[in-house]
Amino acid sequence: MTANLKVLASVFKLRIGVFCALAAIAGALATPGAVPDFAPVMAVALAVLLSAAAAGAFNHYWERDIDPMMNRTRNRPFATGQFAAGPLWPLGLLALTVAAVALAAFAANAWAALHVFLGAFVYGIVYTVWLKRRTAWNIVIGGLSGSFAVLAGAAVAVPTLSPESLILALVLFLWTPPHFWSLATALKDDYAAAGIPMLPVVCSETETNRIILANTIALVASSLLPAFFGAGPLYLGAAILGGGWFLYKSVALVRRPGRKAAMGNFFASLIQLVLLLTAVMVEPLLAG
């Protein structure tokens, strides 16, 4: 039973889905004004989780031909044949996405539903189907899926786009490339074997690491912008601490390149995101 649950959690990429759901909650709480009602925020967060899970499972389904070529993915259920890749899978995942969009529309409004749909569409179709095997900049556009999670949550509080929610969406957009490129650097041989043109595959190590550093600088700078829109000391401290650590590890990656440094940068990106989202969610609650 436990093994089956682990397989399903892997196929539906629930860890990514949980991060997206937290981003949606953060988006709702980052929007100025009174703290929104608990029920619609949680409903939209669930909708984001479900739509992200559907997109993640579709990613597994679509990439079943190349996953066996990569050490990291060769044991995925679709790659091994543990799950039969019949037509019911995409139909079921489409139905799950429709249900998630309907939940957001019912619990909040049409804007929240639109952002839930766009997040799933960008990851499942734009990134997975259209871009991943064609361009090294695939993950740059794919990073919009996290931004739409923020905007879905923000729409619960205020359907129109606020500067605060747009800045947080920008932070998620800028966070994704250096996060994923760091992992791709460590797994460069896997992506090369599968013929996927990730940035570390098509660019030199030096060029890739400099691009990661430049993106991290832009990310850290954008994460400080909420200070000009009323963000409190908790958020500012989290942004400085998490951003400073991520920036330090990105500089280290440029100076001492290698797999160990790349994974260190990857984990630094996770620390930064956790600190930022936690601060965004906690600070409004402490303020009452």
Swiss-Prot record:
Catalytic activity: heme b + (2E,6E)-farnesyl diphosphate + H2O = Fe(II)-heme o + diphosphate
Enzyme Commission number: 2.5.1.141
Protein origin, superkingdom: Bacteria
Cellular component, GO, one term: plasma membrane
One GO-annotated biological process of the protein: heme O biosynthetic process
Pfam families linked to this entry: UbiA
Membrane protein topology class: Multi-pass membrane protein
Pathway info: Porphyrin-containing compound metabolism; heme O biosynthesis; heme O from protoheme: step 1/1
PROSITE patterns the UniProt entry points to: UBIA (PS00943)
UniProt main location, coarse: membrane
Residues passing through the membrane, by range: 16-36, 38-58, 88-108, 111-131, 139-159, 166-186, 227-247, 266-286
Gene3D superfamilies in alphabetical order: UbiA prenyltransferase
Keywords: Cell inner membrane, Cell membrane, Heme biosynthesis, Membrane, Transferase, Transmembrane, Transmembrane helix
Entry annotated with the keyword Calcium: no
InterPro entries given in the database record: Protohaem_IX_farnesylTrfase, UbiA_prenyltransferase, UbiA_prenylTrfase_CS, UbiA_sf
Subcellular location: Cell inner membrane
Enzyme class at the top of the EC tree: transferase
Function comment: Converts heme B (protoheme IX) to heme O by substitution of the vinyl group on carbon 2 of heme B porphyrin ring with a hydroxyethyl farnesyl side group.
Family listed: Belongs to the UbiA prenyltransferase family. Protoheme IX farnesyltransferase subfamily.
Note from the entry: Carbon 2 of the heme B porphyrin ring is defined according to the Fischer nomenclature.
Protein name: Protoheme IX farnesyltransferase 2
